[in-house]
A protein has these predicted regions:
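Active-site catalytic microenvironments in core metabolic enzymes, especially phosphate/sugar-handling
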Residues: 1-258
Length: 258
C-alpha cells in the first residue's frame, strides 16, 4: 500500500479541489509514493501525536487540521510545528490533512453534526458548487421548545456548558449548523429560514441576534471531532484488512473549562 492509495480514497470522498483558497489541505509531509502499513487518525497533529505514531508503528498520520497552515520561514525543533515536522521526517511518517474539503461535503464535518442532532432533509447551507459548500441546514423531526433543544445539543455533543444568544420564544423546527469557526455563515443561516444556528468560535457581537433567531456556540473542537471517526471508517471500509487506529489521546482540545 502506498500513501497515494490512501489519499485517493479520501479525495474521492472530499476532493482537494474544493478546499478554500486559504487552506492547506493535502499531503504536507512525505511522498505519495511512500509505502504505508498503518495509519493513525486525529483531529490535530502535534509532536505528541507523532510520538504516538512512532510508538504504535504508524507510518502515516491523517488529521482534519493541517499541521502547516502557511509558509514556514524556518523549521526548528524549538517551534511546535517544526518539531513535529522534523520528527515525522526522521521516522518516515507521512502527514495528510483533510480540512475544508471535508467541511464542504454534505457527509463531512457539518453533516456529521446534523446527524448527531437527528436533523432530516439536510442540505448544504452556503453552496458554492454542485452539492458542495460550507455548513448544512435541516429540520428537526418534530418541533421542539428551546429548552429541549438545549438539552439535546448538550447531550449529543457531550457538553458541560453551552454558550447561547438570548433564547427565542416559540418552537424550533429548522436548524443550520457549521463545524469549526462559523461566524461568516450567520447571514446564510438566517436566510435559510433556520430559527437556530449552531457553530463554534462565534464572536461577542454576533450574539446580538434579531427576534426569532438564535445562536449556540458549542466550541470549535466539539463541533468537528466526529470527522476523525468519519475518516477512520472511510479507510477501514475501503481497506478492511489494513491497520488503522484512532489516537488514544483523542481529546486534543486546547481549551479548558473550569
Amino acid at each position: 500500500m502506498k500513501v497515494r492509495d490512501i489519499i485517493a480514497v479520501i479525495e474521492d470522498f472530499a476532493p482537494l479541489s474544493i478546499q478554500e483558497g486559504w487552506d492547506n489541505s493535502g499531503l504536507c509531509v512525505g511522498s505519495p509514493e511512500a509505502e504505508v502499513s498503518s495509519v493513525l487518525f486525529a483531529l490535530d497533529c502535534t509532536e505528541s501525536l507523532v510520538d504516538e505514531a512512532i510508538e504504535c508503528g504508524a507510518d502515516m498520520i491523517i488529521t482534519h487540521h493541517p499541521l502547516i497552515f502557511s509558509g514556514l520561514k524556518k523549521i526548528s525543533p524549538e517551534d511546535q510545528v517544526g518539531a513535529a515536522v522534523i520528527k515525522a521526517i526522521k521516522n518516515g511518517i507521512s502527514i495528510y490533512a483533510a480540512h475544508t474539503n471535508a467541511d464542504k461535503v454534505v457527509a463531512g464535518v457539518s453533516g456529521a453534526m446534523a446527524a448527531k442532532l437527528g436533523l432530516v432533509d439536510v442540505q448544504i447551507l452556503d453552496e458554492d458548487g454542485e452539492g458542495t459548500g460550507l455548513g448544512v441546514v435541516g429540520n428537526l423531526p418534530q418541533p421542539l421548545a428551546v429548552e429541549s433543544v438545549m438539552s439535546l445539543v448538550k447531550d449529543r455533543f457531550s457538553l458541560k456548558v453551552l454558550k447561547s444568544s438570548k433564547p427565542l420564544d416559540g418552537m424550533i423546527t429548522r436548524v443550520a449548523m457549521c463545524g469549526g469557526s462559523g461566524g461568516s455563515l450567520i447571514g446564510a443561516a438566517r436566510k435559510s429560514g433556520a430559527q437556530l444556528y449552531i457553530s463554534g468560535d462565534i464572536s461577542y457581537h454576533n450574539f446580538f441576534t434579531p427576534e426569532g433567531f438564535m445562536i449556540m456556540d458549542i466550541g470549535h473542537y466539539e463541533s468537528e471531532i466526529e470527522i476523525v471517526n468519519i475518516l477512520f471508517s472511510l479507510i477501514r471500509k475501503n481497506f478492511p484488512t489494513f491497520a488503522v487506529r484512532i489516537t488514544q489521546n483523542i481529546n486534543s482540545n486546547p481549551i479548558y473549562y473550569f
